[in-house]
Design a protein with these regions (language model features):
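Cytosolic juxtamembrane helix and N-cap/initiation of the first transmembrane helix
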Residues: 1-20
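Short juxtamembrane and helix-loop transition motifs at transmembrane-helix boundaries
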Residues: 38-47, 68-77, 99
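Membrane-helix boundary connector in multi-pass membrane proteins
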Residues: 74, 91-108, 125-128
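Interfacial loop at the N-terminal end of multi-pass membrane proteins
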Residues: 2-7, 30-52
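Core segments of alpha-helical transmembrane spans in multipass integral membrane proteins
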Residues: 19-28, 47-70, 84-88
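Non-cytosolic membrane-interface motifs at loop->transmembrane helix junctions
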Residues: 42, 78-82, 102-112
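Hydrophobic alpha-helical membrane segments
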Residues: 79-93
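Membrane-water interface at the C-terminal end of transmembrane alpha helices
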Residues: 27, 97, 116-128
């Protein structure tokens, strides 16, 4: 595929990536269940719950920003840089823990995030 494909389809790419990212509202609503499903562990106590809820809200907001960027081309650069940074950080943290999360839901989420970053970088290179 050439660069024109990603430029022509970026609106849909951002909507899909944003919607998938926004599903991370789940940790805000059910923090213990979300962490147990994703990592096989739970962040214990009131502080763990607070941080888990906040983490879920921030990822949800990132998803909304990606959807916003689908309709506002002028906002894409900072939003894509921000989303790429957060997604790369999560993937690096999951992968750096060796096999600890290899069979947990966190691993396919990390791979999905890396795939999204690949699409974002492809777009940014195509329009630069």
């Amino acid at each position: 595929m050439n660069a024109s494909w990603i430029v022509a389809n970026m609106e849909w790419v951002l909507i899909v990536c944003g919607a998938l990212t926004a599903t991370m509202l789940f940790p805000m609503i059910a923090p213990r269940l979300a962490f147990k499903q994703m990592f096989g562990e739970v962040a214990e106590g009131p502080l763990g719950e607070l941080l888990t809820r906040n983490w879920g809200q921030m990822i949800f907001a990132t998803g909304l920003l990606l959807i916003y960027a689908a309709y506002h081309e002028e906002a894409r650069l900072p939003i894509l840089v921000f989303a790429s940074f957060t997604k790369l950080t999560f993937a690096a943290l999951v992968l750096s823990n060796g096999g600890r999360y290899g069979r947990k839901l966190a691993m396919p989420i990390a791979v999905g995030d890396l795939s999204m970053v690949g699409l974002f970088v492809w777009y940014l290179l195509a329009v630069s």
